[in-house]
């Protein structure tokens, strides 16, 4: 997908705001791993009310607009799956 200048980073979330929202109930960070449907994800529901789309993660994985969310984890706004393409070494290859 071609990135244009309009895409902003999704809201920060989780302990000390070290994660990013990946969906309304998903918060992930490189050091945190992923929270799904926990109190850490409550802030992510605010994304639904913001008018512009957002993007989290750097490396695409798994299709359907998903991207690497934490080492070994690939997330879309719908959920997360284990994905070896997202291992820490692969992120910086």
From Swiss-Prot:
Domain of life: Eukaryota
GO molecular function, one term: neurohypophyseal hormone activity
Intracellular or extracellular location(s): Secreted
Coiled-coil residues: none
SMART domains linked to this entry: NH
One annotated Gene Ontology cellular component of this protein: extracellular space
Keywords: Disulfide bond, Secreted
Gene3D superfamilies for the chain: Neurohypophysial hormone domain (2.60.9.10)
Intrachain S-S bonds: 10-54, 13-27, 21-44, 28-34, 61-74, 68-86, 75-80
InterPro entries: Neurhyp_horm, Neurhyp_horm_dom_sf
Family classification: Belongs to the vasopressin/oxytocin family.
Record protein name field: Neurophysin 1
């Amino acid at each position: 997908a071609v990135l244009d200048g309009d895409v902003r980073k999704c809201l920060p979330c989780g302990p000390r705001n070290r994660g990013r929202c990946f969906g309304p109930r998903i918060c992930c960070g490189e050091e945190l791993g992923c929270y799904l449907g926990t109190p850490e994800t409550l802030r992510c529901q605010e994304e639904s009310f913001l008018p512009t789309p957002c993007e989290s993660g750097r490396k695409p994985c798994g299709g359907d607009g998903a991207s690497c969310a934490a080492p070994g984890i690939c997330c879309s706004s719908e959920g997360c799956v284990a994905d070896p393409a997202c291992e820490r070494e692969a992120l910086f290859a």
